Amino acid sequence: GFREDVITYISKREGLPNAIPIPVAAGMEHYNCGPHLYEYLKEFHDDVLSKYDCFTVGEGPLITPEKVLRFVTEDDTQVLKTMFSFDHLEADCFMTDWIKTPFNLKKMKKCYQKWYDAMNGKGWHTLYLENHDHPRIIDRYGSLKYRVESGKMLATMCYLQKGTPF
């Protein structure tokens, strides 16, 4: 397989325009899902990936399900098999782990439902709760006092959904 880290950041708008001032990821509106992203991914897919029987997963911070479907829909336009999103990890933060907010279970559930509804029958979704960017999920969404129970609960919640577990 092949993992394409923060792949949605490889296409930037021309002219180096000024960014909207926000506390994190300044300028993201100019490089997240930029104007040539699909073109670049299509070229990489056609010239390299299509020559191998391989699984590809992209990472797309702050991407919508509708944009993900542009890349993973199972037809002749497909350039990735699936893509990581981070929406479900924003149940206790704003855009990034550095701006903490109280945990919001309803927000997390709405996020999972939104992605399930969008991807169902059109593309394949990724299932994960932590990675190198977002470690220690039991400490974050569970209880250290009940770490075994928390781990089982989080794993059950994650892995009984439709998608590929990571």
Residue ranges and their predicted role:
Residues 1-166:
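Active-site and adjacent substrate-binding regions of carbohydrate-active enzymes
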